[in-house]
């Protein structure tokens, strides 16, 4: 009986490990993120190969609601280099996100507020599944960005002074 419990333990550790494949640093600069959520993503085989090779760009991506589903738009996943052009995917195709109905309704109600949008923050491997982190945020104005940069530089100076 002890042998089986060890096997279960090792499998749960694998599921908790994740490998970052792509990150959208620009979104963290452009938006004040108020809420994040993890979602699955519906991909083709060649898209999975490209993402595992780090060929995904989340910078211009955003999410939209259609027919009770949430779609990821304008995310560029480069075609896989070792596959012929006939079998490759469209780099900018719309991709369906896999969320529970309650989560979709909650996200939709959050984005109906003025200025709120859903942006992809990161793509990562969780076990053998590719997951995406979405952020609900409001666009920052220029003066907000300047204040953030000032605060960041002040924190940097304080940390460097404390290290001395």
Swiss-Prot record:
One of its GO terms (biological process) is trans-translation. One of its GO terms (cellular component) is cytosol. Keywords: Cytoplasm, RNA-binding. One of its GO terms (molecular function) is RNA binding. InterPro entries: SmpB, SsrA-bd_prot, SsrA-bd_prot_CS. Required for rescue of stalled ribosomes mediated by trans-translation. Binds to transfer-messenger RNA (tmRNA), required for stable association of tmRNA with ribosomes. tmRNA and SmpB together mimic tRNA shape, replacing the anticodon stem-loop with SmpB. tmRNA is encoded by the ssrA gene; the 2 termini fold to resemble tRNA(Ala) and it encodes a 'tag peptide', a short internal open reading frame. During trans-translation Ala-aminoacylated tmRNA acts like a tRNA, entering the A-site of stalled ribosomes, displacing the stalled mRNA. This is SsrA-binding protein. The gene is smpB.
């Amino acid at each position: 009986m002890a042998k089986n419990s060890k096997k279960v333990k090792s499998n749960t550790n694998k599921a908790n490990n994740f490998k970052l494949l792509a990150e959208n640093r620009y979104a963290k600069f452009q938006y004040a993120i108020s809420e994040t959520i993890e979602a699955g993503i519906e991909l083709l085989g060649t898209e999975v190969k490209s993402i595992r090779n780090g060929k995904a760009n989340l910078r211009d991506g955003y999410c939209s609601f259609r027919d009770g589903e949430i779609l990821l738009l304008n995310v560029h996943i480069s075609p896989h280099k070792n596959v012929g052009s006939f079998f490759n995917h469209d780099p900018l195709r719309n991709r369906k996100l896999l969320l529970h109905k309650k989560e979709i309704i909650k996200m939709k109600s959050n984005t109906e507020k003025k200025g709120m949008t859903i942006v992809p923050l990161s793509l990562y491997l969780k076990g053998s599944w590719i997951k995406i982190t979405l952020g609900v945020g409001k666009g920052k104005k220029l003066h907000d960005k300047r204040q953030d940069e000032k605060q960041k530089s002040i924190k940097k100076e304080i940390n460097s002074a404390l290290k001395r």
